[in-house]
Amino acid sequence: MLFDKDGTLSHSEPRLIALADARITEALERFQAMGASESELSELHDLLARTYGRCESGVTPDGTLAVASRQHNLLSTATVFCQMRLGWPRALVLADEMFDAVDQHHQDKSSTGNSTALLPGAAAFLRELKAAGVVCALISNDTTAGIQSFIDAHQLGDCITDVWSADNHPSKPDPGAVHGLCTKLNLKASHCALIGDADTDLLMARQAGIGITLGYVAGWHQSPELTAHEHLIHRWSELTLEGRSNKF
């Protein structure tokens, strides 16, 4: 069983709201120091908010921040800076510096013991799968360190056999990410199920030949609109194991 992390097992929206706001604030401060006018700062704020999927009620579940990797978000940010009339080399350097500064702040906060909460029922289902002998793994666009921190914080190390992160190549949503993880697990993709909260995950799974694709929609304030699933899950308690066959 292959699991996405953010928005599927992890209640990530509060952390992503804070991350989006921190990146926007950092960008505004840097452009202000460069002499940007109030109208330019307002334009930059709106462009970044739309780019990250930051809305009044939270983060859109299919937005760049929620779905894409850090590198893809960095490139999206640099593209916004180009719209603010910076050249690409300067925009890319500025985005990289901005992301590093915000990441350091969030790393300092996470070292104080703050951790993203598990979604209701996720831990119980993982332990049920472990007890039944089902191999479980995480496939995420978070870093390896971020995934391991999540596993350690919730004491899931005995439930998770392996991970595939943004540090692995190829990363999601390339179907090769699924093949790479299945190779590490010594399993055929057709013998696995994948559950995620984004169509990019589910389409990737189908293209990789995954046996069952499950869409999960309860991880966000606004339910994601999924189309590439075989089954749709609204809460973890809807999933049960059938007898000794380990089928869902």
Language model regions located:
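N-terminal helical cap/lid subdomain that shapes the substrate entry/recognition surface
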Residues: 1-120
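Conserved G/P- and acidic residue-centered "switch" motifs that form tight phosphate/ATP-binding loops
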Residues: 8, 140, 197
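Asp-based, Mg2+/Mn2+-dependent phosphohydrolase catalytic module
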Residues: 1, 29, 123-131, 144-248
